[in-house]
Amino acid sequence: MIVNTRPSILANKTNDLLARSGIEFMHEPLTKILSISPSNQALEKLQQLDSYDVIIFTSQSAAKFGAPYLQKHTSKNLNLLIMAIGLATQRVLSEHGLVSEVPSGFNSAGLAELIEQGKHEKCLIFCG
C-alpha cells in the first residue's frame, strides 16, 4: 500500500502510474503549496543575478513560483546557466521561456556532479 501525500496539483501523474501498475494506493494530500510575496532579502538576491554562476530549481513548485521572479529580474542579455532537478521541473521552466539543463540521474548527486564539473562557486537555489 502506498499513500501519496503530494498536493493534488502534483499527484495526478503518480496516481495514474500507480493505478496502471495495479499497485494499491490512496491519495491523501497532506500538504498545500501556496504562493506568497518574497521577502526584501530575497528580492535583493534576485537583483544580483549576474553575480551567480548557476541558478538551480529543485522542484516543479520551485519552478512554478520562482520562474516569474527570475524573469522579472533578468536582463534579456544576461546569459544565465539554469539547472533543473528532473524533467518535470525542466518542463515548467520551459513553459516560462527558460532554458535549463538537467543533471544525469535527475537527482541531487547528479546536480552536485554537474556543479563540480563546471566549477560553479556561487549558486542561487530555488527549492520548495
Task: Locate predicted features.
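Conserved beta-alpha
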Residues: 1-128
